[in-house]
From Swiss-Prot:
The PsaA/B heterodimer binds the P700 chlorophyll special pair and subsequent electron acceptors. PSI consists of a core antenna complex that captures photons, and an electron transfer chain that converts photonic excitation into a charge separation. The eukaryotic PSI reaction center is composed of at least 11 subunits. Belongs to the PsaA/PsaB family. GO terms for molecular function: 4 iron, 4 sulfur cluster binding; chlorophyll binding; electron transfer activity; magnesium ion binding; oxidoreductase activity. The keyword Chloroplast applies. This is Photosystem I P700 chlorophyll a apoprotein A1. InterPro entries: PSI_PsaA (IPR006243), PSI_PsaA/B (IPR001280), PSI_PsaA/B_CS (IPR020586), PSI_PsaA/B_sf (IPR036408). GO terms for cellular component: chloroplast thylakoid membrane; photosystem I. Keywords: 4Fe-4S, Chlorophyll, Chloroplast, Chromophore, Electron transport, Iron, Iron-sulfur, Magnesium, Membrane, Metal-binding, Oxidoreductase, Photosynthesis, Photosystem I, Plastid, Thylakoid, Transmembrane, Transmembrane helix, Transport. The lineage of its organism: Eukaryota, Viridiplantae, Streptophyta, Embryophyta, Tracheophyta. It is an enzyme of class 1 (oxidoreductase). PsaA and PsaB bind P700, the primary electron donor of photosystem I (PSI), as well as the electron acceptors A0, A1 and FX. PSI is a plastocyanin-ferredoxin oxidoreductase, converting photonic excitation into a charge separation, which transfers an electron from the donor P700 chlorophyll pair to the spectroscopically characterized acceptors A0, A1, FX, FA and FB in turn. Oxidized P700 is reduced on the lumenal side of the thylakoid membrane by plastocyanin. It is found in: Plastid, Chloroplast thylakoid membrane. The chain crosses the membrane at residues 70-93, 156-179, 195-219, 291-309, 346-369, 385-411, 433-455, 531-549, 589-610, 664-686, 724-744. [4Fe-4S] cluster binds at residues 573, 582. The gene is psaA.
Length: 750
């Protein structure tokens, strides 16, 4: 790989007109590879084309050129995101009942899709209330729009148009920064400038501008909506921004302007920057004054953080110095050499970022229900379930991606000669201890967690309920989790001044919030059933980590294949004539890791779905009696495998199975079709390549007989291609099956 040394002084360095814009070249399939550009001889060509189109490492060894391609591709990605967002806002403007929902969010369900009657599928347009017929949506956009202060469909139109303009700008920027003014390598490697700009600009000013919007637009509009003012009567956003008196009527401290700020009398602003905790009883969402305060505080932190790193002014941190000074008593050279890795290997950089982003996505999933950020989100059970499930799946995929890119770094970018006795080298040298210990943990967790269930199933089958692990027999209470819950529940009053409730109602205490006779949130009790399933979570997560980590640590070499690095990231076996060396590539570990990730996330979303229906979601009577959707059956039913099958999977599948002839019938078809896609994957996963090659040759013979033989020779999928197609269909089929099962159920009963 060609690497140029960075210049000491930070300058904005670009190369003018480095690559000619050529539609002729662009239109030629495989132009990035000499072999592929020749065109297809066999059907393998189309697979290789897809596999390598975005593998910029394989196009060139010049790190600068690779960096420019990645940078340009990011603008393309942003353009796609803006187009997608524009579509969402356009649907809200053109096909939705947003204004009706805004006027009565407790009785009207959100819908932003109306099916056209072509072959009778207008049956899918269910009655969502207020005389509107359409498909009920569960994306949470309506709640987000209300929190943003959007009060009309015209505003959604304008935002949709704005997003398209931004998409066009992004497409232009992607072209411009590759073809017209491409940054030099030194610019991509200038980490201090990058940190300063990303922290202060992206996160600092980004949070500050959102806080400004919340304070000047969202808060006053939501205050009036909560008070029952008709959305059409509420002043438009620009009126609040331009007319301070309007704001001062709602938040008196606005009349004082910036005087309290400069006189350090900040508590004057506590009418719109609060620290209450808990939920707004009108909307069942977080107090928007709390979230405005939060974004302002985050902005201050990141604006400070964005001034910490040394650039042209001789003050501030230097990342290389920080890393090289980081030595512990047992870590040898510590982080020495990591700076060079992270400035020359974008795979290493990406692996760390994906690991953190994936974890953060899963944290988001857990906060969306425990601290619902938007008005009326908490009583829209379909949206709650969808947001949790979506963020869990996405987080799982991103974490597997982290392992994939870590392994690619090991194979393609790692240079053992420059890494001696630093942390990475030391981890690699005791990888056998790491993997064997992790394997022991997996076996322990697997046998013990599953064993508890098997014990319960056996006792239940023998009619001995008194000998089961349950809240009413042999208790296994999650005492540590309960201790954490109690600590948080009793925290308000002794922690932040003015906090009247804990961060989340789920911690405990006597509070419950109901909106429109539906439960928004209440304290979530944890018992033996949760203790059991949490150990299944521990087991599946540890196995996923074992597979992925083994793939990374043994990506370059192993006792079985000492020269594995020479074989590349993905290979089927170590050549012919060496048995028992198949499925050992780093790619194969990612492949296997995906199945265990799927296992792990499935158990999590099943646990969440049943627990919430059993112990949280439900309705409240005029006398204050709460009736949960499944009547609190989680604690006693989920402690056996049979209970999971009978009272969760089978009992709750009745809605999707019986959906034909109703507005939910699309979910019934998806449920059926996705089962088929899942089963189809097994044909690829349990296949032998030779079997298909023989079959193909018979079929080609028949075509030759009829003189209709193709010019491009058909070939069976390679082993790796077959596994890739298999895992893709396995995951797609499994996830869509779950999606249809969850939504048909929760829309029918929620």
């Amino acid at each position: 790989m060609i690497i140029r040394s960075p210049k000491p002084e930070v300058k904005i360095v670009v190369e003018r007109d480095p690559v000619k814009t050529s539609f002729e070249k662009w239109a030629k399939p495989g132009h990035f590879s000499k072999t592929l550009a020749k065109g297809p001889d066999t059907t393998t060509w189309i697979w290789n084309l897809h596999a390598d189109a975005h593998d910029f490492d394989s196009h060139t060894k010049d790190l600068e050129e690779i960096s420019r391609k990645v940078f340009s591709a990011h603008f393309g990605q942003l353009a796609i995101i803006f187009i997608w967002l524009s579509g969402m806002y356009f649907h809200g403007a053109r096909f939705s009942n947003y204004e009706a929902w805004l006027a009565d969010p407790t009785h009207i369900k959100p819908s932003a899709q109306v099916v056209w009657p072509i072959v009778g599928q207008e049956i899918l347009n269910g009655d969502v209330g207020g005389g509107f017929r359409g498909i009920q949506i569960t994306s949470g956009f309506f709640q987000l729009w209300r929190a943003s202060g959007i009060t009309s469909e015209l505003q959604l139109y304008c935002t949709a148009i704005g997003a398209l303009i931004f998409a066009a700008l992004m497409l232009f920027a992607g072209w411009f920064h590759y073809h017209k003014a491409a940054p030099e390598l030194a610019w991509f490697q200038d980490v201090e400038s990058m940190l300063n700009h990303h922290l202060a600009g992206l996160l600092g000013l980004g949070s500050l501008s959102w806080a400004g919007h919340q304070i000047h637009v969202s808060l006053p509009i939501n205050q009036l909506l909560d008070a029952g003012v008709d959305p059409k009567e509420i002043p438009l956003p620009h009126e609040f921004i331009l007319n301070r008196d309007l704001l001062a009527q709602l938040y008196p401290s606005f009349a004082k302007g910036l005087t309290p700020f400069f006189t350090l009398n900040w508590s004057e602003y506590s009418d719109f920057l609060t620290f209450r905790g808990g939920l707004n009883p009108v909307t069942g969402g977080l107090w928007l004054t709390d979230t405005a305060h939060h974004h302002l505080a985050i902005a201050v932190l990141f604006l400070i953080a964005g001034h910490m790193y040394k650039t042209n002014w001789r003050i501030g941190h230097n990342l290389k110095d920080i890393l090289e000074a980081h030595k512990g008593p047992f870590t040898g050279e510590g982080h020495k050499g990591l700076y060079e890795i992270l400035t020359t290997s974008w795979h290493a950089q990406l692996a760390i970022n994906l690991a953190m982003l994936g974890s953060l996505t899963i944290i988001v999933a857990h906060h969306m229900y425990s601290m619902p950020p938007y008005p009326y989100l908490a009583i829209d059970y379909g949206t709650q379930l969808s947001l949790f499930t979506h963020h869990m799946w996405i987080g799982g995929f991103i974490i597997v991606g982290a392992a994939a890119h870590a392994a690619i770094f090991m194979v393609r970018d790692y240079d053992p000669t420059t890494q001696y006795n630093n942390l990475l080298d030391r981890v690699l040298r005791h990888r056998d201890a790491i993997v064997s210990h992790l394997n022991w943990v997996c076996i322990f967790l697997g046998f013990h967690s599953f064993g508890l269930y098997i014990h319960n199933d056996t006792m239940s089958a023998l009619g001995r309920p008194q000998d089961m692990f349950s809240d009413t027999a042999i208790q296994l209470q999650p005492i540590f989790a309960q201790w954490i819950q109690n600590t948080h529940a009793s925290a308000p009053g002794s922690t932040a001044p003015g906090a009247t409730a804990s961060t989340s109602l789920t911690w405990g205490g006597g509070d419950l919030v109901t909106v429109g006779s539906k439960v928004a949130l209440l304290p979530i009790p944890l018992g033996t059933a949760d203790f059991l399933v949490h150990h299944i979570h521990a087991f599946t997560i540890h196995v996923t980590v074992l597979i992925l980590l083994k793939g990374v640590l043994f990506a370059r070499s192993s006792r079985l294949i000492p020269d594995k690095a020479n074989l590349g990231f993905r290979f089927p076996c170590d050549g012919p004539g060496r048995g028992g060396t198949c499925q050992v590539s780093a790619w194969d570990h990612v492949f296997l890791g995906l199945f265990w990730m799927y296992n792990a996330i499935s158990v999590v979303i099943f646990h969440f779905s049943w627990k919430m229906q059993s112990d949280v979601w439900g309705s409240i009577s005029d006398q204050g009696v709460v009736t949960h959707i499944t009547g609190g059956n989680f604690a006693q039913s989920s402690i056996t495998i049979n209970g999971w099958l009978r009272d969760f999977l089978w009992a709750q599948a009745s809605q999707v199975i019986q959906s034909y002839g109703s507005s939910l019938s699309a979910y019934g078809l998806l449920f059926l079709g996705a089962h088929f896609v899942w089963a189809f994957s097994l044909m690829f996963l349990f296949s032998g390549r030779g079997y298909w090659q023989e079959l193909i040759e018979s079929i080609v013979w028949a075509h030759n007989k009829l003189k209709v033989a193709p010019a491009i020779q058909p070939r069976a999928l390679s082993i790796v291609q077959g596994r890739a197609v298999g895992v893709a269909h396995y995951l797609l089929g499994g996830i869509v099956t779950t999606w249809a099962f969850f939504l048909a159920r929760i829309i029918a009963v929620g």
